Amino acid sequence: MLNVLFVCSQNRLRSPTAEQLFADWPGIETASAGLNHDAEVPLGPELVEWAGLIVVMETRHREKLRKRFKAQLREQQIVCLNIPDDYDFMDPELIQLLRQKVPQFLPDIAEAR
């Protein structure tokens, strides 16, 4: 089972959309968090350690993640989607972008069954 963590700034729009969108993907568990201290679910060391794959929305998220959680980052793959903070929660355009960009990093559906 691959633990996939989706990260944005506030954990209000992009990362929870991704978490919900891929929650039923075979072979993975999903979670989401935000890097800002006032995020809905603030990112903590436990979530970073839990994750096998960390998917960030912007390059600044990757840099913050690497600085703040240096001790917890070991073998995790960190992927940046380059999706700006221009979308609402479950925005159809955001969903389309996520469907285009994320599956290449997830276990193949056929292999997971």
Annotate the PLM regions.
Residues 1-113:
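Short polar/charged helix/loop
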